[in-house]
């Protein structure tokens, strides 16, 4: 383990189109193999599709992220010879990261024909508390609820 202390949190520059740090992080999460321009086209394309139905796309994205973000998750903890799934609260930075990851993964699994449409549909569903990302959050919360008895093993 390093003795130099923790590394400082990297700052993300706000995205050029909307000036939002959340959207910039979302673009970075969508990006694959360093292709940022492709990721920007996907996210901005999805926001344009959302913009046709809802004039305030940024608020809708924020609402979708808030709906998907988990409050608790389970972590494995070894005690004696047994491994317990211990429920722990999720810190805010990890909440947003998980919400973005789940939204993007669910969007990639959807059946629409282009990625911007898949992402837009998933964001619209998540803002109305339905869709694959919401299912993932509910499953995580169910796991934490089922293992509430092991909450005293927290670290």
Curated annotation (Swiss-Prot):
It comes from Xanthomonas euvesicatoria pv. vesicatoria (strain 85-10) (Xanthomonas campestris pv. vesicatoria). Belongs to the universal ribosomal protein uS7 family. One of the primary rRNA binding proteins, it binds directly to 16S rRNA where it nucleates assembly of the head domain of the 30S subunit. Is located at the subunit interface close to the decoding center, probably blocks exit of the E-site tRNA. InterPro entries: Ribosomal_uS7, Ribosomal_uS7_bac/org-type, Ribosomal_uS7_CS, Ribosomal_uS7_dom, Ribosomal_uS7_dom_sf. Keywords: Ribonucleoprotein, Ribosomal protein, RNA-binding, rRNA-binding, tRNA-binding. This is Small ribosomal subunit protein uS7. It holds the Pfam family Ribosomal_S7. Part of the 30S ribosomal subunit. Contacts proteins S9 and S11. One of its GO terms (cellular component) is small ribosomal subunit.
């Amino acid at each position: 383990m390093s003795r130099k202390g923790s590394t400082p949190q990297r700052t993300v520059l706000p995205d050029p189109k909307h000036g939002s740090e959340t959207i910039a992080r979302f673009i970075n999460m969508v990006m694959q193999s360093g292709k940022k321009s492709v990721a920007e086209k996907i996210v901005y394309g999805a926001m344009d599709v959302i913009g046709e139905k809802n004039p305030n796309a940024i608020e809708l994205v924020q609402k979708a992220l808030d709906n998907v973000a988990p409050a608790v998750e389970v972590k494995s903890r070894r005690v004696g010879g047994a491994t317990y799934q211990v429920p722990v609260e999720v810190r805010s930075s990890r909440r947003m990261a998980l919400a973005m990851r789940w939204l993007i993964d669910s969007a990639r699994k959807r059946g629409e024909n282009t990625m911007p449409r898949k992402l837009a549909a998933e964001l619209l569903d998540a803002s109305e508390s339905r869709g694959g990302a919401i299912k993932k959050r509910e499953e995580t919360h169910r796991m934490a609820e089922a293992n509430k008895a092991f909450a005293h093993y927290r670290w």
